[in-house]
Structure formats: structure tokens, C-alpha cells
Amino acid sequence: MLKTRIIPCLDVKDGRVVKGVQFLELRDAGDPVESAKAYDAAGADELCFLDITASHEARGTLLDVVSRTAEACFMPLTVGGGVRTVADVRTLLLAGADKVGINTAAVKNPDFVAEAAEKFGDQCIVVAIDAKRVSGPDEAARWEIFTHGGRNPTGIDAVEFARTVSERGAGELLVTSMDKDGTRSGYDIALTRAIADAVRVPVIASGGVGGLDDLVAGVRDGGASAVLAASIFHFGHHTVGEAKAHMAAAGLAMRLDP
């Protein structure tokens, strides 16, 4: 049985870790390399860096932070933000990323996903999906893709887009609920489950973790293969070890350090 992964996420802006609520109201949470080293020591299964300034301000990705983190840490590292070309993917992989997250560019051109997966292997291509519920209370649930850090609506159905990019070669999908992001009210389980049921690749649940039971629900109810969280770890509400123990006690297969 594949073990469930816990993935702390470091949102990086101007070289600092930040954490916002629904992609806004950013507050400083520390140095990314030091944070990464702490998560590595704590037993995190993977780490995710998202350069949240890159897409909408046309910033380059944080290669210096990535390379210093890769030198200091042994856990797999996913890096996203501002990835627009195959050359961007290559540069991040050479800097030390194990996987590269593609967001806005995949929405603009799903064939870019196929091109990157063919060149580097689908195992290192993660498509990041930022979605917001657009259906009314009496309608069937429907979510729309947003790009550029959640600023631009696209009119694209999130579940259909997930199906498209998984067929084009995405090895994994990072699904973030913009409605839940930073609220500490739990994942959007319906969104996570809808996408997990629609694709054959692993889904990472993201956006809204407030407690350890939310992590369990993301896997058990949402069908996620991995759970991503930020605030509960960054600000000391829980440790990665506590999260793993809680999930294991709930019957989920976890990688537990001796």
C-alpha cells in the first residue's frame, strides 16, 4: 500500500515565507531555507515551494533558495511559480527541484504539460489547480479555475481541466481550494473528491487545514494521496510528527520515522 504523504508548503514572496488568507493579507513566516531544514528534520515526506509573486509580477523563480534548500535537505522538493517554458522546468530541476509545479502556463496551453512530461518524465510534473466554487447552493457543485495567484477567473471547469492535464502527462495534481485557503476550516472535500475520482494520477489536497482531523478527512473522504498544509505547521499548532501519528492512528498508512 502506498503511504500517505504529508507536504508542508512554503509560500515564498520576495525571498521570505509568507502565509495569507484566501491568497491575500500576507504575513511573514520566516526564512525559507531555515524552514525547509526544520521540516526535513521533522520528517516531512516532501516539501513544496510556491513563489506566489512569480506569475503575476513576472518574477523569475527562486533559484538561489531552491539550490540552497536542495543542498541542505534530503526530502523531495516541489517548486512552482512563474514556470512558463520547458527551459524554466529544466532550470528548476538543475537547481535541485525534484518536481516542478505548473499553474498558469498549463491553463493557457495544456500542451505545455505534455511537452514537459515528454522531456523530463511525468513523475516530475505537477499541475497546480487553484479553484473556486462557482455553483449556487441549489446547483450541482461546480468549480472554476483561477490563475495568476488567484486573481484571474478563466471560465474553465476545474474537474474537466484536471482530466485534461492528467491525460496530457501531469504526474500529480495539487488541488487548492481558494475558498478554503488560509481559513483553517478544513479542505474542500467535495472538490478534492470530484477531481480524485476523475483522474488516475495522485491528488494532493490543499487549502484550509485547521487541525489534524482535516488531514485525515482529505485522504479518507477526499480521496487524496497526499495532504498539503502550511499554517498549522508554520505557526506551531502541530508538528509533522504529531500529524503522522494522528493519521496513522486513524488507520492511514504513513511513513513513520523510527
Curated annotation (Swiss-Prot):
Q: Any idea of its EC number?
A: 4.3.2.10
* Metabolic or biological pathway, per its Swiss-Prot or TrEMBL entry: Amino-acid biosynthesis; L-histidine biosynthesis; L-histidine from 5-phospho-alpha-D-ribose 1-diphosphate: step 5/9
**What residues make up the catalytic site?**
D11, D130
Q: Which residues form a coiled coil?
A: none
Catalytic activity line of the entry: 5-[(5-phospho-1-deoxy-D-ribulos-1-ylimino)methylamino]-1-(5-phospho-beta-D-ribosyl)imidazole-4-carboxamide + L-glutamine = D-erythro-1-(imidazol-4-yl)glycerol 3-phosphate + 5-amino-1-(5-phospho-beta-D-ribosyl)imidazole-4-carboxamide + L-glutamate + H(+)
Q: Name one GO cellular component term.
A: cytoplasm
**Where located?**
Cytoplasm
Q: Which UniProt keywords apply?
A: Amino-acid biosynthesis, Cytoplasm, Histidine biosynthesis, Lyase
Offer one Pfam family short name for this entry. His_biosynth
Any one Gene Ontology BP term:
L-histidine biosynthetic process
Q: GO molecular function: any one?
A: lyase activity
Q: Does the keyword Cytoplasm apply?
A: yes
For this chain, the family text in UniProt reads: Belongs to the HisA/HisF family.
Q: Give the matching HAMAP family.
A: HisF (MF_01013)
Function, as annotated, reads: IGPS catalyzes the conversion of PRFAR and glutamine to IGP, AICAR and glutamate. The HisF subunit catalyzes the cyclization activity that produces IGP and AICAR from PRFAR using the ammonia provided by the HisH subunit.
Assembly, per entry: Heterodimer of HisH and HisF.
Q: What is this protein called?
A: Imidazole glycerol phosphate synthase subunit HisF
